[in-house]
Amino acid sequence: MANILKTIIENDKGEIRRLEKMADKVFKYEDQMAALTDDQLKAKTVEFKERYQNGESLDSLLYEAFAVVREGAKRVLGLFPYKVQVMGGIVLHHGDVPEMRTGEGKTLTATMPVYLNALSGKGVHVVTVNEYLSERDATEMGELYSWLGLSVGINLATKSPMEKKEAYECDITYSTNSEIGFDYLRDNMVVRAENMVQRPLNYALVDEVDSILIDEARTPLIVSGANAVETSQLYHMADHYVKSLNKDDYIIDVQSKTIGLSDSGIDRAESYFKLENLYDIENVALTHFIDNALRANYIMLLDIDYVVSEEQEILIVDQFTGRTMEGRRYSDGLHQAIEAKEGVPIQDETKTSASITYQNLFRMYKKLSGMTGTGKTEEEEFREIYNIRVIPIPTNRPVQRIDHSDLLYASIESKFKAVVEDVKARYQKGQPVLVGTVAVETSDYISKKLVAAGVPHEVLNAKNHYREAQIIMNAGQRGAVTIATNMAGRGTDIKLGEGVRELGGLCVIGTERHESRRIDNQLRGRSGRQGDPGESQFYLSLEDDLMKRFGSERLKGIFERLNMSEEAIESRMLTRQVEAAQKRVEGNNYDTRKQVLQYDDVMREQREIIYAQRYDVITADRDLAPEIQSMIKRTIERVVDGHARAKQDEKLEAILNFAKYNLLPEDSITMEDLSGLSDKAIKEELFQRALKVYDSQVSKLRDEEAVKEFQKVLILRVVDNKWTDHIDALDQLRNAVGLRGYAQNNPVVEYQAEGFRMFNDMIGSIEFDVTRLMMKAQIHEQERPQAERHISTTATRNIAAHQASMPEDLDLSQIGRNELCPCGSGKKFKNCHGKRK
């Protein structure tokens, strides 16, 4: 182990020496660039672009380009990048992560690789964790880029598709990670190529890269469509039942945060819902509601996992930042179960139309890099998942912060009492204090204690993060006391006020250890920026989550023997033990993310195939007849082959029924037409007849553009519907194969094999539906459209299934508004023939 660590340290030192030499080459151009006039310096951008177009690589342009940015930054921003910032910029250009401490100027560091890569004209995405940082950085650094002749765009959620497209067309685009993901998904749901907003993903530079690529790696971005099933009553019933349970009726696994019914709980469920057997196959839906109600009531905690807004909505709290995640909902019905628990209106359950995780989104970029102050602890994951190295960059000035050993108390109460006393003492001498908490309720609790102690303070948590930057900027002033959930205000520097250095700088107090060392290091890093003095101190108790999960029983005995209910244990050994526990949790979390990626890679491969074919359809300026006719041919072959082993009479009857109801006019084919033919001859006979029907259908459109539009809309409508259903099916499969793991089967291998089979089935189903709709659609004879704008509407309107006509003798007054329409459209009656005129 010691040898491995030695090798890693030596490698890092060698890398630093190499970067220093490269930075020196940039510095050699300093005088040359300083001698240029403003116009001459700006003209360098055009020169670099031409040299790149003529075959010169970005690597060879690096030294001059970085020197141009340094000089430009000095003239425009009044900032001159240090050597360590140039080194960080080189690492970013190479597609790696420079680990740069808080306050080392990561934003300015990014300007050099962003400028260099923007010269290619293929687009650079600067990715931030929230829109405030996107707008701030785009405004501040955009001044420099614009001065140097590059265009800068900001992609915000509120922008229209046209505005988004303009932002993505710029040389440099600032955006949040979620908006890039949603735009990618939406681009793959449009019907026309001109409605796509993104260009191919080229180079991403991700700010706070660990937060996005590690903490949020498993977060799926989901574009949903409302599900028509009205299930709010079942949510309320399940919630009412679960609230009636005793502690013996359910079993919670604290480590894995899972919950299930005990035997007595099952008995109570069968009695409550009047069932013979809760786990009969017909009760599968009900057990799903009960499982969610259990999780909502006994696992998900108010003010820790979620908050209830003033608008009576459930808002998820990000466990790493403490911010509420606007617009984000728990999937699979859990969010509705929480709504039932809290007695707020239950919103419609949604169906996933498209989804992608950040892991797979960012792996699609040709080059990916990012910045963080705390990436080394996750180096293995960056390397294994993203093929990125983490290179620690030296600080411009030595770190002067004093990190005290952890203080461990027997109870939460005695811990918080000590925290309040410490804060009060520091406040009285004028030293600013930042108190970091892991949950909203902890912030509120400490706030009440400080009010009682007469200590004025600011609270920054998920409930008021819109004031984040303002509060954080003032946190370094004399006498300032700020309480913040761990990651709040990240990206905004805390600058020390007048006279604060002499008082010891900013003191950071952690109220418990996070399960990730990196988050603790980020909290510590708020103090001691740019060589400032500072302190950090963590207060722990045996009742903290991390301590309860890993070995607090032995320490509890020590406290009891020494009768130390109010006193603290302080030792380096304790700090090392806590870090060992954190390493175990980090290892577990990494293994989980790695497994999620194995599952998601199945979806990724399938998504890429579907999206590539979809893109081919929407960008095709050609007649898609060859593609559709191939689908018809394969559909015929599947049907005939599928009945190959049946008795001759049964086989012919099945094939005839298929042909009548899906392929040809009903009265145009009889049993005599097929009898006596081999399977091969039947396939050929049906295909030739189908081609005549196809030609007849297309001839009704009488316009080449209308034909193309009809073909596109037909294929895309079927593909999108089937893909949406397939995503749901894969989600259900994933849950199911998890159970198969108990039968000694590898669930990932099972998922891959079953997922591949399901994908092939979906392709067959797509081709079948395209065939049926193409052959059976009622296409009305129409004149040539007068203007192109009419084409889409008429072509879309003409896709009406042959069966979608209403029986003449039906009494419509007897049909419920939420029942399926009898015309066969698949819509609810109220949305079809029951629409109020």
UniProtKB/Swiss-Prot annotation:
Give the record's GO biological process terms: intracellular protein transmembrane transport; protein import; protein targeting; protein transport by the Sec complex
Q: Which reaction does it catalyse?
A: ATP + H2O + cellular proteinSide 1 = ADP + phosphate + cellular proteinSide 2
EC assignment: the record states 7.4.2.8
Q: Which UniProt keywords apply?
A: ATP-binding, Cell membrane, Cytoplasm, Membrane, Metal-binding, Nucleotide-binding, Protein transport, Translocase, Translocation, Transport, Zinc
Q: Which cofactor does it need?
A: Zn(2+)
The subcellular localization recorded is: Cell membrane; Cytoplasm
Cited PANTHER family: CHLOROPLAST PROTEIN-TRANSPORTING ATPASE, SECA INNER MEMBRANE COMPONENT OF SEC PROTEIN SECRETION SYSTEM
The subunit field of the Swiss-Prot or TrEMBL record says:
Monomer and homodimer. Part of the essential Sec protein translocation apparatus which comprises SecA, SecYEG and auxiliary proteins SecDF. Other proteins may also be involved.
Protein name per UniProt:
Protein translocase subunit SecA
* Family classification: Belongs to the SecA family.
Record's cofactor remark: May bind 1 zinc ion per subunit.
**Name of one Pfam family that matches:** SecA_DEAD
* Purpose of the protein: Part of the Sec protein translocase complex. Interacts with the SecYEG preprotein conducting channel. Has a central role in coupling the hydrolysis of ATP to the transfer of proteins into and across the cell membrane, serving as an ATP-driven molecular motor driving the stepwise translocation of polypeptide chains across the membrane.
